[in-house]
């Protein structure tokens, strides 16, 4: 670049630079090569220099062409490989004939090409290995030559010391002045790795490219300028491909900006390049590039350079080799002396350090065309000014050398100086002068001839070795810079272009291969069409034949299977028919066995006659010919009987034998129990009736026992005969009379019969529910006073004492035994089962036997294990939910006959329950056989058949609609429930979930959900009650008398001080004498405000400073029309009109408050004028007017007033409820106690307080009796009505009871119903399922002031007895609240004639028993039953299920299929009633009475 500065005449602003800088830089680069040129060999050295430069460019061109060939070979090889692979992939399905020899013809050419390619690759490898050895030898020679040059340079170091010292001084100032050199040296050190790769390529060259330059420029300028490029190369080596693209884009942008700055210079240089002759390039000699290590694979592996840097360098070198043939260099003639040239060099170095021109002006390269066929790449390269001038110089030097040689050969005779002058003259028009002095000494310089010892041209100036090396180093750096610029800018573009070309070529190859494949397939389809058609037809024929035979085999197999299946079905059907016949015979055998036994027992005890039913002849046709008493008892094993071979007659005989055997076993068991008892008891007389032999009893009629203290009715006496016959036969039974027919007295009468007629006084065991224990004890004591009763209940210690009365030695008790009958509960039986099982009981009675309806319960199992001669079950509802409960009772009394529940279920349960649920057709024959089996063991009479004086009860279902709050709660529950609502309703209708003890977790969750819905139907307050609302009271409350009394006694001054009283003024004497004043207002505000006296006197107190007194005087005196001094005529007229003698009275009244005027008028003096006469009525009214507001007299005289206040004023409710309340702030005026007392006592005015409050009763008594004050003289009190006083005197708001009633549909209807029933004189039983609902009902009854009592499960046994007694004897009690489970069993509540079910039980029989507490013997009035239901809720589903259960009971017990008579009344939102009749007509009077009650 220094040569370009010398040639550039326009650069005249270069600053001075130190001359010693070159010396300092020379020491750092002392190992640079310098050519020793002799003065006598100037032309030879120039020629050598030009030849060396030409060889450099030729070597670069050759390297690029080899690289291009190598890349083309690799690309073609890869494409051929991909083409072959794709072709093979597409030709996999080609089929060839194995016998044809031409099957591999299409592969032979391909194999031949592949072998040729492999051979070429081997030759190329050998060529590369040979070149590698030559490169190594050349490197060794270059190193020897460098050693020689170093020795030459050491000799010249002494000559350069002076210049070096001067350069250091100047350089030091420059560095301290600018502060740039240190940073550039650091950047140069960081770029050493990249510069090393470029210097390696320079060492491979034969000679140095440049001969001019400056050492200082190399050390400072070149290093500084190369830092950016080298740093970018380092970044390219360290970063990924993504970062490479970013760096390339940044470099391209920088280069583009540099190109824009020198567009004008490039245009001029390109015009000069186009004028050059192409003949000038013939002088360059071509040499082989033996040092090409870049294309050797082995050497390339050892080099760890960046791929982007190496590819960019190669591409730039290729581009430069193509452009060297187009550049022309000019011959350089120096006309100035050595100091001027040195100054120009210093200016050149300082110019590069300037900030504005610090950047290099890089070369621009553009690819214009690429021909892949000829492997020709056309590149347009635009060089900057410096590069163009350098090439011009080189080309001109070569041209001059060529002309000089031609002149020498032709003997022109021109010497070297003339030639130089000609050359200088020819090129003088193209050169620019460095300064004004160059033109003056131009001719002298051309005439001088210089000879140098080192062989380098000095161009007419004296140049030492150091300056020559600097110029050489400059051209070396310029050469490196050119390659860096081209590598950085153009390599990426060329790489992208090559990749694009390769992708296009790959696409074309792929398309070509696909086209070849298609063409090959066409050829194949033409040649092999007949073969393919033949194969297709053969395959189709084979497939059709295979399908035909497969179809044929499948049809034969299906036909065979069908025949086998029909045969199996026929055999199965025959087996099923045979099995059904066998099962029918088994069922008939079992039924016949049971019927024979039942028929025999029925004839003995005559159950049909006792029930009042006529027996048809058809019922006993099958039993007339067989007498089981005459047959020999023989037990036939049921499983050993051959039901297939034996006929019906033989099976009947076997069944009769089994029935006879069962009868014999029953008798033997009873005889064994009696014999064992007789062995330990008293011996009986021989002539006494032997009751142990029932066959000798015959038909006898038992009379009522004499020890029974009552008279049995006819049907009860028949029941006694039936029970006695059962005992005689040793058979257990079920007394299932309808509730209220006296099952208790019948069971007591049979005990009296055994004691009186058979001298069996026990031990007898009676097990009852806990609620009927006292009733049984009372009944036995009442009807059998001679019996000793042992009530067995209480705690563990009490029961332990009671067990001492047991006599375990004697199995039969006498009259003098410790006890005769022990009464206990089911709970005690389970608790003390171990003790009770040790006793042998003569007779065990189970009251309310539905308690053992479950065969899985501990009650059933424990009671079944007791040792008893006979068992008697008392129940009004033997079937509550299903037929399984009936089987449990039957198995309990006859385990030998009813031993299998599955058989019983097969006989009756399925048919009857399905009939009740699905209303299917009932098998009447099967129902008749069931009744025949049950009759000997169960006696049931209905009230209407045996008790004519007891009328039918009227049942009415009252349907209500949900209120708004209930409907919202119901919908919220339905939306929040996780289970389907239909499943919940089904669970509500499932009876097993409510009674079974072993419910699953899911069923229990369903039941809980059902209970939530039932709570909504009953009352929404079951979820959340409305609380009492009270504001925060910012108040100091007054202390009551009791608190003050305790405070005085304890000398607690804090309480008294809070009450604004002095302890000294109080004494126990005053407290005990009651000298306290009753105050209706005692609360005070905790805040006390002290009003300044100045403000009071100036603003409030009337004075001359304000108009307070004037305004009051004007308003009350001057503007008052009743002032006599102003309006005398009006006052006189009013005085005459009213008879008031004083004219000032009107003025006084007008200034008196209204309340005080009313009080004064009522308390005014009586008129004692003798002329006024009053009647007795008027005097009584006068007394009435002044009567006190409390007491009996006030209540009697003010009935109308109290009714008005209760009905109307009570409805007034507070509309606003404040959150905070406080009395007025206490105001005190400092220094004025009068004002403070008047303000504080404003609410305690005696006249107002007395008028608003009531005089206590004790005070009235003392005033009238002790002090003798007449009643008419009492002050008027109670002017403020009590309801308003209750509602407005306090901010505490309680929940409204009216709203409490109206928010529940059931309670609202019940409220209307109770009003009617109360007015008509009825007494009501109300049954509940929830005790919490009973609590709410008690609040309602207290609000309505209905007299009521309550009995639930928490009531004690002694309390239950007293409650029942009070209900039966006290007619003032209007309502009896009972829980269905606790109050629905075993108690007599005939004092009530109305039963209301607020919510129904799961089991309809529980409700039936609860109804019969009132509808039983002793009831003389019509009984009406109301059932409250909510329409469209879960209660309707429960009611439907209850009706199905009731139908099952009717079918089994009565044989009826008609629905029960129930009247339904639907109450809508507007309280309109719609009556729906039942299936059977009932008493019209009862319906009218019930309807009138609901009206």
From Swiss-Prot:
Please give the name of this protein: Chromatin-remodeling ATPase INO80
- Its EC number(s): 3.6.4.-
Q: What is known of its domains?
A: The DBINO region is involved in binding to DNA.
Matching entries from InterPro entries are given as:
DBINO, DEXQc_INO80, Helicase_ATP-bd, Helicase_C-like, INO80/SWR1_helicase, P-loop_NTPase, SNF2-like_sf, SNF2/RAD54-like_C
Query: Where does the record place Low complexity bias?
Result: 307-317
Biased composition (Basic and acidic residues) is annotated at: 399-408
Q: Which residues bind ATP?
A: 737-744
- MF (Gene Ontology): ATP binding; ATP hydrolysis activity; ATP-dependent chromatin remodeler activity; DNA binding; histone binding
Q: What top-tier enzyme class does this entry carry?
A: hydrolase
Keyword Amino-acid biosynthesis applies: no
PANTHER family found in the cross-reference section: CHROMATIN-REMODELING ATPASE INO80, HELICASE SRCAP-RELATED
Q: What does this protein do?
A: ATPase component of the INO80 complex which remodels chromatin by shifting nucleosomes and is involved in DNA repair. Its ability to induce transcription of some phosphate-responsive genes is modulated by inositol polyphosphates. The INO80 complex is involved in DNA repair by associating with 'Ser-129' phosphorylated H2A histones as a response to DNA damage.
Residue ranges, compositional bias (Acidic residues): 140-164, 214-297
Start and end of every Helicase C-terminal domain? 1309-1473
Q: Which reaction does it catalyse?
A: ATP + H2O = ADP + phosphate + H(+)
What is the gene name? INO80
Pfam families xref list: DBINO, Helicase_C, SNF2-rel_dom
Motif DEAQ box boundaries: 847-850
Give the start-end ranges of region Disordered: 137-317, 399-458, 1462-1495
- Residue ranges constituting the DBINO domain according to the UniProt record: 482-607
The family note in this entry says: Belongs to the SNF2/RAD54 helicase family.
Keywords assigned by UniProt, alphabetized: Activator, ATP-binding, DNA damage, DNA repair, DNA-binding, Hydrolase, Nucleotide-binding, Nucleus, Phosphoprotein, Transcription, Transcription regulation
For this protein, the record's PROSITE patterns field holds:
DBINO (PS51413), HELICASE_ATP_BIND_1 (PS51192), HELICASE_CTER (PS51194)
Q: Any idea where this protein resides?
A: Nucleus
Q: Which CDD domains match?
A: DEXQc_INO80 (cd18002), SF2_C_SNF (cd18793)
Q: Does the keyword Transcription regulation apply?
A: yes
Q: Which SMART domains match?
A: DEXDc, HELICc
């Amino acid at each position: 670049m220094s040569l370009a500065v010398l040639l550039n005449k326009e650069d005249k602003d270069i600053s001075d630079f130190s001359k010693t800088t070159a010396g300092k830089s020379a020491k750092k680069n002392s190992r640079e090569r310098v050519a020793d040129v002799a003065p006598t060999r100037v032309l030879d050295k120039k020629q050598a220099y030009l030849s060396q430069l030409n060889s450099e460019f030729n070597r670069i061109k050759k390297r690029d062409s080899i690289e291009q060939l190598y890349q083309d070979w690799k690309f073609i090889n890869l494409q051929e490989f991909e083409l072959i692979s794709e072709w093979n992939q597409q030709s996999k399905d080609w089929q060839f004939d194995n016998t044809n020899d031409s099957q591999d013809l299409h592969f032979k050419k391909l194999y031949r090409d592949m072998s040729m390619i492999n051979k070429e690759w081997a030759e190329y490898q050998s060529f590369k290995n040979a070149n590698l050895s030559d490169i190594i030898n050349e490197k060794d020679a270059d190193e020897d030559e460098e050693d020689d040059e170093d020795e030459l340079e050491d000799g010249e170091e002494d000559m350069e010391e002076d210049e070096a010292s001067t350069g250091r001084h100047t350089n030091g100032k420059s560095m301290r002045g600018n502060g740039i050199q240190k940073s550039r040296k650091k950047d140069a050190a960081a770029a050493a790795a990249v510069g090393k790769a470029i210097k390696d390529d320079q060492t491979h060259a034969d000679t140095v490219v440049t001969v001019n330059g400056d050492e200082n420029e190399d050390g400072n300028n070149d290093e500084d300028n190369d830092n950016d490029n080298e740093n970018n190369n380092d970044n390219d080596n360290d970063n990924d491909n993504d970062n490479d693209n970013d760096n390339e884009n940044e470099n391209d942008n920088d280069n583009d900006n540099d190109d824009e700055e020198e567009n004008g210079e490039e245009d001029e240089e390109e015009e000069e390049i186009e004028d050059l002759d192409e003949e000038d390039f013939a002088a360059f000699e071509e040499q082989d590039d033996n040092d090409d290590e870049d294309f050797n694979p082995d050497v390339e592996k050892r080099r760890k350079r960046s791929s982007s840097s190496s590819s960019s360098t190669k591409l730039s070198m290729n581009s430069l080799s193509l452009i060297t043939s187009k550049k022309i260099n000019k011959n350089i003639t120096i006309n100035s002396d050595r100091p001027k040239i040195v100054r120009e060099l210093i200016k050149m170095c300082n110019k590069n350090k300037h900030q504005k021109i610090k950047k290099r002006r890089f070369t621009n390269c553009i690819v214009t065309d690429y021909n892949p066929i000829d492997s020709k790449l056309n590149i347009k390269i635009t060089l900057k000014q410096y590069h163009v001038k350098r090439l011009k110089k080189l080309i001109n030097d070569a041209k001059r050398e060529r002309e000089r040689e031609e002149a020498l050969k032709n003997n022109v005779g021109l010497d070297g100086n003339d030639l130089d002058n000609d050359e200088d003259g020819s090129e003088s028009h193209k050169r620019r002068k460095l300064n004004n002095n160059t033109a003056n000494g131009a001719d002298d310089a051309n005439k001088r001839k210089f000879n140098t010892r080192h062989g380098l041209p000095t161009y007419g100036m004296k140049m030492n070795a150091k300056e020559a090396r600097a110029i050489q180093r400059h051209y070396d750096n310029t050469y490196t810079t050119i390659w860096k610029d081209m590598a950085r800018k153009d390599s990426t573009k060329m790489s992208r272009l090559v990749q694009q070309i390769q992708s296009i070529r790959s696409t074309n190859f792929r398309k070509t291969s696909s086209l070849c494949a298609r063409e090959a397939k066409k050829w194949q389809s033409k040649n092999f069409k007949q073969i393919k058609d033949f194969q297709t037809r053969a395959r189709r024929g084979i497939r059709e034949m295979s399908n035909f035979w497969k179809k044929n085999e499948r049809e034969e197999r299906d036909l065979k299977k069908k025949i086998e299946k029909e045969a199996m079905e026929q055999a199965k059907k025959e087996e099923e028919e045979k099995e059904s016949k066998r099962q029918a015979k088994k069922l008939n055998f079992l039924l016949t066995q049971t019927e024979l036994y039942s028929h025999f027992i029925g004839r003995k005890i005559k159950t049909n006659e006792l029930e009042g039913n006529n027996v048809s002849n058809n019922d006993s046709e099958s039993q007339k010919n067989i007498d089981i008493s005459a047959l020999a008892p023989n037990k036939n094993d049921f499983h050993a009987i051959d039901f297939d071979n034996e006929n019906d007659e033989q099976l009947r005989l076997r069944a009769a034998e089994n029935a006879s055997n069962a009868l014999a076993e029953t008798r033997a068991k009873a005889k064994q129990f009696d014999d064992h008892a007789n062995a330990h008891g008293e011996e009986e007389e021989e002539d006494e009736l032997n009751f142990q032999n029932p066959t000798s009893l015959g038909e006898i009629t038992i009379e009522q026992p004499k020890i029974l203290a009552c008279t049995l009715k006819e049907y009860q006496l028949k029941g006694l005969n039936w029970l006695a016959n059962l005992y005689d036969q040793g058979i257990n039974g079920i007394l299932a009379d309808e509730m209220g027919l006296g099952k208790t007295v019948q069971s007591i009468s049979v005990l009296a019969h055994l004691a009186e007629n058979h001298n069996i006084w026990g031990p007898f065991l009676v097990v009852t529910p806990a609620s009927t224990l006292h009733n049984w004890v009372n009944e036995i004591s009442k009807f059998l006073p001679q019996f000793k009763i042992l009530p067995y209940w209480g705690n563990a210690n009490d029961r332990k004492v009671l067990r001492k009365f047991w006599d375990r030695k004697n199995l039969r008790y006498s009259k003098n035994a410790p006890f005769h009958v022990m009464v206990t509960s089911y709970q005690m039986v389970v608790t003390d089962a171990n003790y009770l099982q040790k006793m042998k009981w003569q007779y065990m009675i189970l009251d309310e036997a539905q308690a053992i309806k479950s065969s899985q319960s501990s009650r059933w199992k424990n009671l079944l294990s007791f040792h008893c001669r006979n068992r008697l079950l008392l129940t009004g509802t033997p079937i509550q939910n299903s037929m399984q409960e009936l089987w449990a009772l039957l198995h309990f009394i006859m385990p030998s006959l009813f031993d299998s529940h599955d058989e019983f279920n097969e006989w009756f349960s399925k048919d009857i329950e399905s009939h009740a649920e699905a209303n299917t057709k009932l098998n009447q024959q099967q129902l008749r056989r069931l009744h025949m089996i049950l009759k000997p063991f169960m006696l049931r009479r209905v009230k209407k058949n045996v008790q004519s004086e007891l009328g039918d009860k009227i049942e009415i279902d009252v349907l209500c609609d949900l209120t708004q709050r209930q409907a919202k709660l119901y919908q919220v529950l339905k939306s929040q429930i996780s289970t389907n609502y239909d499943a919940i309703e089904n669970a509500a209708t499932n009876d097993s979930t409510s009674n079974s003890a072993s419910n699953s977790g899911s069923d229990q969750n369903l039941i809980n959900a059902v209970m939530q819905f039932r709570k909504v139907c009953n009352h929404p307050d079951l979820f959340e009650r409305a609380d009492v609302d009270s504001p925060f009271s910012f108040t100091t409350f007054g202390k009551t008398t009791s608190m003050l009394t305790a405070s005085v006694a304890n000398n607690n001054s804090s309480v008294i001080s809070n009450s604004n009283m002095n302890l000294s003024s109080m004494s126990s004497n005053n407290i005990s004498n009651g000298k306290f004043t009753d105050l209706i207002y005692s609360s005070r505000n905790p805040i006390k405000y002290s009003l300044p006296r100045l403000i009071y006197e100036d603003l409030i107190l009337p004075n001359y400073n304000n108009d307070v007194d004037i305004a009051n005087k004007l308003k009350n005196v001057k503007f008052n029309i009743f002032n006599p001094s102003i309006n005398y005529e009006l006052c006189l007229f009013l005085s005459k009109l009213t008879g008031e003698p004083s004219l000032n009275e009107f003025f006084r009244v007008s200034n008196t408050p209204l309340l005080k005027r009313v009080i004064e008028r009522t308390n005014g003096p009586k008129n004692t004028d003798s002329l006024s006469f009053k009647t007795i009525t008027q005097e009584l009214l006068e007394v009435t007017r002044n009567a006190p507001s409390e007491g009996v007299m006030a209540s009697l005289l003010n009935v109308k007033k109290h009714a008005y206040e209760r009905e109307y004023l009570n409805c007034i409710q507070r509309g606003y409820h404040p959150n905070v309340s406080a009395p007025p702030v206490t105001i005190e005026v400092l220094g004025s106690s009068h004002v403070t007392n008047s303000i504080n006592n404003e609410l305690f005015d005696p006249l107002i307080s007395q008028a608003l409050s009531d005089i206590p009763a004790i005070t009235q008594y003392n005033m009238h009796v002790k002090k003798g004050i007449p009643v008419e003289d009492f002050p008027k009190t109670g002017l403020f009505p009590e309801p308003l006083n209750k509602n407005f005197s306090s901010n505490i708001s309680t929940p409204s009871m009216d709203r409490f009633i109206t928010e529940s549909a059931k309670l609202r209807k019940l409220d209307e119903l109770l009003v009617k029933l109360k007015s008509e004189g009825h007494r009501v039983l109300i049954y509940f399922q929830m005790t919490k609902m009973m609590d709410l009902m008690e609040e309602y009854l207290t609000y309505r002031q209905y007299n009521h009592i309550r009995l639930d499960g928490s009531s004690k046994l002694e309390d239950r007895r007293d409650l029942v007694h009070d209900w039966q004897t006290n007619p003032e009690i209007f309502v009896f609240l009972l829980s269905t489970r606790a109050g629905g069993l075993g108690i007599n509540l005939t004092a009530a004639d109305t039963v209301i079910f607020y919510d129904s039980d799961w089991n309809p029989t529980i409700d039936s028993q609860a109804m019969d507490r009132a509808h039983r013997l002793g009831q003389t009035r019509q009984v009406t039953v109301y059932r409250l239901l909510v329409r469209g809720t879960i209660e309707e589903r429960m009611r439907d299920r209850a009706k199905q259960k009731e139908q099952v009971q009717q079918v089994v017990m009565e044989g009826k299929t008609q629905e029960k008579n129930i009247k339904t009344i639907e109450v809508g939102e507007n309280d309109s009633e719609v009556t729906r009749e039942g299936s059977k007509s009932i008493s019209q009077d009862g319906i009218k009475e019930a309807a009138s009650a609901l009206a």
